[in-house]
C-alpha cells in the first residue's frame, strides 16, 4: 500500500494489477482502499464463463480492467467483459498481446465497434511497429487516433 501511495503523488492514471493473480481477497482489499486506480490484467486470463466473470468483478471491484482479446475469449469474450464491466461501473480498455499487423487490425476494429465514439482514453494498439518482418500495416496512427488506410 505504501508504494501505491507514493505512485499516487505522480498523477498516474492507474496501475495494472500490483499483486499476482488468484488472490481475490487481497486484491479486493487493495481495490477498496487504493489511492491509485487499479486495472486488472492477468487476473482475467482463463476466466471465460460469464458467471465467473461476474463473480470476479463483484468480488474484487476493480476500478478498471485491461482486455487483450486473444487472451480473453476473442471478440465475443471481450465484448462480454466490457458489457459486464459497464454494468458494474468499471472502466475498461483494450490492448494488444503483441499481435502482428493482421491481428492488430482486428483488435483495432473490435475496439472501434465496442467503444465507438465513447472511447475515453488511449487504447494499447501501437505494438504492430515492433516487428521487423511484419506484414504491411493497414492502419496508421494520426494524432491520437488510429485509422484504416485507404486502398
Predicted regions and their residues:
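Flexible C-terminal active-site loop/helix
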Residues: 97-151
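Catalytic beta/alpha-barrel core
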Residues: 10-23, 36-47, 63-73
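Active-site/ligand-binding-proximal alpha/beta "capping" segment
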Residues: 76, 82-89, 144-147, 151
Amino acid at each position: 500500500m505504501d508504494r501505491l501511495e507514493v505512485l499516487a503523488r505522480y498523477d498516474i492514471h492507474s496501475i495494472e494489477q500490483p499483486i499476482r493473480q488468484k488472490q481475490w481477497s487481497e486484491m479486493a482489499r487493495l481495490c477498496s482502499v487504493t489511492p491509485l486506480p487499479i486495472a486488472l490484467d492477468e487476473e482475467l486470463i482463463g476466466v471465460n464463463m460469464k458467471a465467473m466473470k461476474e463473480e470476479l468483478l463483484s468480488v474484487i471491484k476493480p476500478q478498471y480492467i485491461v482486455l487483450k482479446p486473444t487472451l480473453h475469449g476473442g471478440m465475443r469474450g471481450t465484448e462480454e467483459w466490457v458489457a459486464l464491466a459497464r454494468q458494474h461501473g468499471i472502466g475498461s480498455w483494450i490492448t494488444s498481446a503483441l499481435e502482428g499487423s493482421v491481428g492488430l487490425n482486428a483488435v483495432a476494429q473490435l475496439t472501434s465497434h465496442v467503444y465507438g465514439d465513447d472511447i475515453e482514453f488511449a487504447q494499447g494498439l501501437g505494438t504492430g511497429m515492433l516487428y521487423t518482418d511484419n506484414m504491411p500495416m493497414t492502419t496508421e496512427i494520426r494524432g491520437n487516433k488510429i485509422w484504416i488506410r485507404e486502398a
